């Protein structure tokens, strides 16, 4: 059993005296150090969610902190009595060829699955046929019992089907043959099967458990361990022992395993780990020759003759997921292959959803290429060209295909429900691409007519389409690990739509969005409610933080406030000398984003414009308008104090007169944070770093429990602020 799942025993604590703690203190030592909310899953009450994810001991503050070492020593001997270090260390792939118990070097966490005893380790004297026999037996012993599998399948027979075939099989084939049902997982690999085949089964089973509805947990009785614990144990073992072991990565099934790992991580919300796994899959696929247009040169083998795979589909899936994650995380794409949409015949032979995905794949590459270049006047031309490509892609499908499908939880046709859900998610992805494409121009002021009005309206409409479909999806599907990327897309769409409404209150400008404000606000409130409910049902950190962020932004009531929104560089010609400081600041809204800092929105009196700018005609009613400054933060690349020369990119927009500073100055309610103190103040600039910034970024491979937004928030604001330096 995992050490992190074992409550500290009386033997571990001995006669240690309990400490006196402040009333209301419930967090463990590890969560206190990380300044994270200590949450317990009622289904797994032996350790908090954060410690379970990290694989660290969950020690209550009632006990001395130095007892953690005693707990770490529990179970640090193998079954044959051989002691081994319970803490992990970085290892090389060659070391893990001889020692299968070593965790992957890129994830420095204690192992969350039983370690194999020394007698299971392969030796150099083994023949090629028996080289991995001991590893196979060890992995096979980790599989859930048949009784557990039957109990789970019986409870889920009317609620889910398997989707992992999407990674290797064309849509047309799946439509014809149908997707597999959970009962197909009753047949496990043999104990002497190749480790890769057993690992593939383990990852497939873990993905199936990710899609279990949370209300089924109460119906499944008599299991040896909770389904979520089984999911984590199987996936961790497969990843540590197989998918990250270079000696085992030489077959089509091993590539499939890495793709399953990437999908598993993205479902958890671990976008960064998923991206790393996806890059490993891309490299292996290139070794196998998948990137060749004709794919006639084969550099791979199949371990099981029954394995169904299509190299072109697998290559397409790898590239699509890589580009989706790159857009979310603000990273460069892994390859610039556009061949999936270069042939009209190749596109025409696909089904409608397949054609759209191929065209989306190329559009994502062009957006990433634009974002990777320095901002210039050519950006707008490239943006319009990509927009036309997306219009053409949408036009390749029938008009009725774009109607949002109705998802009925009472339906018994699981195959039809799966494809309707897939269609809805693909529609959301299309509108998200429009958002990503035009976001850098959404808040741009134009000195040449309505140069950027098209981008602004496109972002608004695309955000509405994303949010309406998200509400439809989450009314039907409350599983946190299902359709995970849609949660990130909905959060970005909600923030974009709110900022667009703030931008609509420009001085002297006609508000084209005024009539839609209340309905848009109601839709975002519904999104926030769905995220709160998903967190309640699943104890999901991403949903909790997203709901808190939207709640803070929704506290800004634009019905009462008027002003203007502008995007300017600090120190630029349009910068107001007294913008944001002094006693004239009447109210403040502070929104905390972990590892990003404080977004500070201050309602202030309007100041006169600079002499170099022509005066703006104002009506008498606008003379007392308030201006809000939205201060973004420098990235927490280090813990050094901000220098007086630090610059920022403020946004200005309106907030309600009734807003009081004390109403919004606290960080997320579910996080334990210390009060934030400004480290730098200067006329026209306000920076308030987060306490979490003082230690820099979290680990690069930090999971969603420690870094819920995974840098998606930073990429979003970077995109908004892309072209602030002048009118391009």
Curated annotation (Swiss-Prot):
<keyword id="KW-0805">Transcription regulation</keyword>
<feature type="region of interest" description="Disordered">
    <location>
        <begin position="75"/>
        <end position="130"/>
    </location>
</feature>
<keyword id="KW-0539">Nucleus</keyword>
<feature type="compositionally biased region" description="Polar residues">
    <location>
        <begin position="89"/>
        <end position="109"/>
    </location>
</feature>
<comment type="function">
    <text>Transcription factor involved in regulation of the dehydrocurvularin biosynthesis gene cluster.</text>
</comment>
<dbReference type="GO" id="GO:0008270">
    <property type="term" value="F:zinc ion binding"/>
</dbReference>
<keyword id="KW-0804">Transcription</keyword>
<dbReference type="GO" id="GO:0009893">
    <property type="term" value="P:positive regulation of metabolic process"/>
</dbReference>
<dbReference type="GO" id="GO:0003677">
    <property type="term" value="F:DNA binding"/>
</dbReference>
<dbReference type="Pfam" id="PF00172">
    <property type="entry name" value="Zn_clus"/>
</dbReference>
<feature type="region of interest" description="Disordered">
    <location>
        <begin position="606"/>
        <end position="626"/>
    </location>
</feature>
<dbReference type="InterPro" id="IPR036864">
    <property type="entry name" value="Zn2-C6_fun-type_DNA-bd_sf"/>
</dbReference>
<keyword id="KW-0238">DNA-binding</keyword>
<dbReference type="GO" id="GO:0005634">
    <property type="term" value="C:nucleus"/>
</dbReference>
<protein>
    <recommendedName>
        <fullName>Dehydrocurvularin biosynthesis regulator</fullName>
    </recommendedName>
</protein>
<feature type="DNA-binding region" description="Zn(2)-C6 fungal-type">
    <location>
        <begin position="28"/>
        <end position="58"/>
    </location>
</feature>
<dbReference type="InterPro" id="IPR007219">
    <property type="entry name" value="Transcription_factor_dom_fun"/>
</dbReference>
<dbReference type="InterPro" id="IPR001138">
    <property type="entry name" value="Zn2Cys6_DnaBD"/>
</dbReference>
<dbReference type="GO" id="GO:0006351">
    <property type="term" value="P:DNA-templated transcription"/>
</dbReference>
<keyword id="KW-0479">Metal-binding</keyword>
<dbReference type="GO" id="GO:0000981">
    <property type="term" value="F:DNA-binding transcription factor activity, RNA polymerase II-specific"/>
</dbReference>
<keyword id="KW-0862">Zinc</keyword>
């Amino acid at each position: 059993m995992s050490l992190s799942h074992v409550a500290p025993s009386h033997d571990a604590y001995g006669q240690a005296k309990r400490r006196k703690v402040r009333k209301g203190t419930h967090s463990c030592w590890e969560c206190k150090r990380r300044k994270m909310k200590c949450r317990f899953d009622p289904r797994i009450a032996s350790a908090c969610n954060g410690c379970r994810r990290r694989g660290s001991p969950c020690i209550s503050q009632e006990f001395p902190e130095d007892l953690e070492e005693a707990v770490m020593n529990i179970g640090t001997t193998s079954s044959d009595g051989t002691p081994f270090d319970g803490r992990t260390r970085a290892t090389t792939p060659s070391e893990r060829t001889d020692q299968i118990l070593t965790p992957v070097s890129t994830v420095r966490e204690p192992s969350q699955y039983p370690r194999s005893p020394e007698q299971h380790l392969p030796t150099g004297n083994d023949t090629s046929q028996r080289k991995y026999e001991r590893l196979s037996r060890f992995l096979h012993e980790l599989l859930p019992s048949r009784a557990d599998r039957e109990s789970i399948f019986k409870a889920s027979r009317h609620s889910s089907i398997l989707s992992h075939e999407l990674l290797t099989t064309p849509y047309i084939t799946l439509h014809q043959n149908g997707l597999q049902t959970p009962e197909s997982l009753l047949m496990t690999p043999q104990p002497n099967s190749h480790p890769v085949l057993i690992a593939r089964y383990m990852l497939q089973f873990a993905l199936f458990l990710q899609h279990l509805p949370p209300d089924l947990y109460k119906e499944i009785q008599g299991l040896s361990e909770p389904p979520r614990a089984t999911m984590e144990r199987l996936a961790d073992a497969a990843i540590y022992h197989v998918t990250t072991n270079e000696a085992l990565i030489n077959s089509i099934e091993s590539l499939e395993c890495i793709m399953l790992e990437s999908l598993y991580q993205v479902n958890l919300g671990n976008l960064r780990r998923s991206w790393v796994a996806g890059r490993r899959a891309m490299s292996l696929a290139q070794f196998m020759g998948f990137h060749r247009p004709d794919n006639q040169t084969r550099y791979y083998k199949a371990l099981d003759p029954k394995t169904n795979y299509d190299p072109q589909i697998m290559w397409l899936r790898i590239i699509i997921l890589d580009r989706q994650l790159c857009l979310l995380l603000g990273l460069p794409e892994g390859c610039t292959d556009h061949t999936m949409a270069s042939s009209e015949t190749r596109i025409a032979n696909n089904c409608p959803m397949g054609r759209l995905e191929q065209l989306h794949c190329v559009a994502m590459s062009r957006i990433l290429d634009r974002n990777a270049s320095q901002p210039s006047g050519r950006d707008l031309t490239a943006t319009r060209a990509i927009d036309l490509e997306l219009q053409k892609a949408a036009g390749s499908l029938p008009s009725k295909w774009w109607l949002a499908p109705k998802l009925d939880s009472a339906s018994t046709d699981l195959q039809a429900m799966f494809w309707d859900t897939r269609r809805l998610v693909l529609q959301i992805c299309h509108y998200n691409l429009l958002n990503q494409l035009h976001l850098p121009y959404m808040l741009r002021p134009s000195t040449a007519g309505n140069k950027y009005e098209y981008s602004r309206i496109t972002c608004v409409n695309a955000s509405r389409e994303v949010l309406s479909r998200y509400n439809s999806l989450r009314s039907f599907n409350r599983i946190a690990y299902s359709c995970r990327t849609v949660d990130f897309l909905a959060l970005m769409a909600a923030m974009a739509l709110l900022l667009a409404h703030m931008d609509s209150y420009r001085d002297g400008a006609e508000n084209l969005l005024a009539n839609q404000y209340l309905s848009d606000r109601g839709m975002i409130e519904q999104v926030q409610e769905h995220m709160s409910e998903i967190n309640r049902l699943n104890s999901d950190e991403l949903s909790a933080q997203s709901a808190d962020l939207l709640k803070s932004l929704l506290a800004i009531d634009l019905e009462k406030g008027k002003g203007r929104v502008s995007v300017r560089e600090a120190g630029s010609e349009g910068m107001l000398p007294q913008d944001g400081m002094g006693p004239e600041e009447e109210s403040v809204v502070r929104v905390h984003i972990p590892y990003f800092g404080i977004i500070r929105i201050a309602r202030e009196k309007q100041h006169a414009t600079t002499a170099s700018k022509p005066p703006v005609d104002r009506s008498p009613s606008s003379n007392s308008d308030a201006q809000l400054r939205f201060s973004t933060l420098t990235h927490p690349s280090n813990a050094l104090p901000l220098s007086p020369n630090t610059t920022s990119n403020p946004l200005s927009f309106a907030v309600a007169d009734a807003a009081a500073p004390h109403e919004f100055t606290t960080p997320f309610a579910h996080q334990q944070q210390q009060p934030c103190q400004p480290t730098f103040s200067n006329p026209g600039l306000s920076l308030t770093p987060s306490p979490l910034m003082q230690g820099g970024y979290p680990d690069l491979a930090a999971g969603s429990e420690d870094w819920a937004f995974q840098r998606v928030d930073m990429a979003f604001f970077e995109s908004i602020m892309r072209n602030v330096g002048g009118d391009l």
